[in-house]
Amino acid sequence: WVCGNVAIWKPSEKTPLCSIICQKIIGEVLKENNIPEGVSCLINGDYKIGEMLSQSKSIPLVSATGSTRMGKIVSEKVGARLGKTLLELGGNNAIIVTPDADLKMTMMGTVFGAVGTCGQRCTSTRRLIVHEKVYDKVKDSLIKAYNQIKIGDPLDSNNHVGPLIDKQAVESYENAISQVNDQGGIWLVEGEVLSGDKYSSGCYVKPAIAEVNHSLKIVHKETFAPILYLMKYSGDIQNAIEIQNEVDQGLSSAIMTNNLKEAETFLSHWGSDCGIANVNIGTSGAEIGGAFGGEKDTGGGRESGSDA
């Protein structure tokens, strides 16, 4: 819109009401500035709408957000007509914590990144890679912080965590817990689906922390839920970077350190292989003003582009 382009947007079929409200707000802004309302168009529907938009030659650029599987389908459809795509797909975002990290800042970035929006952001923190020298201190502080989390109605400002979006998301959460158990992970904070009058929807879950080896299969998958995988590294920063980069996804990443050399290494071409790299902030929440996008199985292209 800012550049004068018409946008047709299709939201997730799980959030039709949110999209209608957003479209109404956009429409009011357009009207106030004497811009035709058709500059922003909303189409609600299932995957068939997405297929139609991907195949339409009237749409030169398709920006798609979703799973890696979905992104491959969109890429094929748009590529068949030589169109352009921006793909923001799965994320498996990690924070590296070095011996020189500020512990308070680490806790703030990690907890917000892992449990904010109930772990349902593409940039949510999924993995915490901690140096052995500060591992126990970080682990103890993290458990203490999780024990203070309040779960409930997201419209109540006293609560920190709301529900997962639907029962399908709850099933994915429970399946990930089962895989952690089968693969030998150790629960530091156990997850569960909450019940009772406050949680009558059946979609409220407890944020969980599992102590794991970085090689576990479940750790290499994105679980769109508040499950954090805690793992240890030893030696220099390059060892932590190798663990971070070994997954297929490459959206957001962060390092907690007061060591300038470590930070520069992380940001360099031999550092993080993600589209977004942060220093002394978490993986989630600070990216809105920048060129947004990922690498590897997260797709390609950048929202906002080089102008950001």
What is the predicted function of each stretch?
Residues 1-105:
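Rossmann-like NAD(P) dinucleotide-binding subdomain of oxidoreductase/dehydrogenase enzymes
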Residues 6, 47, 68-69, 73, ...:
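Gly/Ser/Thr-rich beta-alpha loop segments that engage phosphate groups in nucleotides
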Residues 9-12, 43, 64, 96, ...:
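Active-site-adjacent beta-strand anchor residues
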Residues 28, 61, 69-214, 238, ...:
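ALDH superfamily catalytic-core signature
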Residues 35, 59, 96, 150, ...:
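Conserved C-terminal structural/oligomerization subdomain of aldehyde/semialdehyde dehydrogenase
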Residues 46, 65, 113, 257, ...:
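Conserved residues at the C-terminal ends of beta-strands
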